[in-house]
Design a protein with these regions (language model features):
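A recognition module on extended beta-rich or small alphabeta surfaces enriched in W/G with H and D/E
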Residues: 102-143
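N-terminal low-complexity, intrinsically disordered segments
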Residues: 2-65
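Domain-length accessory/inserted modules outside core catalytic folds
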Residues: 13, 18, 28-30, 89, ...
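Amphipathic protein-protein interaction modules
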Residues: 66-118
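A sequence-level detector of short, solvent-exposed, charge-rich linear segments
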Residues: 40-43, 47, 70, 74, ...
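Generic structural signal for hydrophobic core residues of well-folded globular domains
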Residues: 54-58, 82-83, 118-122
Length: 143
């Protein structure tokens, strides 16, 4: 047996997955409203500014993993709408997580933890830089 990448399987989002993602989006919308930010997320790059304001306000602590990952879902919605990716569930030896898939390829982006891991590790979160870096990575999918 070769030591390589863990085997990944892709699945369409099931109803339960859709409900969970919608709960996470609703949490972020409500948090933005409570912070007097425009809670109108549209999937465009302007959403990055709202997410950055939430992060900069330190509205969530490093221990609030689900809530921080909810920010990652909204970030993922920006990648999806701007780069033609679609949400899928990816299952491997480590578990089952939402990811963004490029067409029917194995090219994936995992936005769920892009914000949470940085905050949990005490690192700066620059959403514009994250967006630009991941966008460059996504551009390689079409080369």
């Amino acid at each position: 047996m070769s030591a390589g990448k863990p085997k990944q399987e892709f699945f369409a989002l099931e109803r339960e997955d859709l409900v969970h993602l919608e709960k996470q989006r609703a949490f972020v919308h409500e948090l933005a409203r409570r912070l007097d930010l425009s809670p109108s997320f549209s999937g465009n790059v302007g959403d990055l500014q709202i997410l950055q304001k939430i992060v900069d306000a330190s509205a969530l602590s490093a221990s609030q993993t689900w809530e921080l990952q909810s920010l990652g879902i909204v970030l993922g919605d920006v990648f999806a709408s701007q780069h033609g990716l679609r949400w899928v569930m990816v299952e491997d030896e480590y578990g089952r997580d939402p990811a963004l898939r490029f067409q029917n390829t194995s090219n994936l982006v995992f936005p769920l933890t892009m914000i949470s891991k940085r905050i949990e590790d005490g690192k700066e979160v620059d959403l514009q830089a994250i967006y630009e870096g991941v966008s460059a990575y996504i551009a390689e999918f079409t080369e």
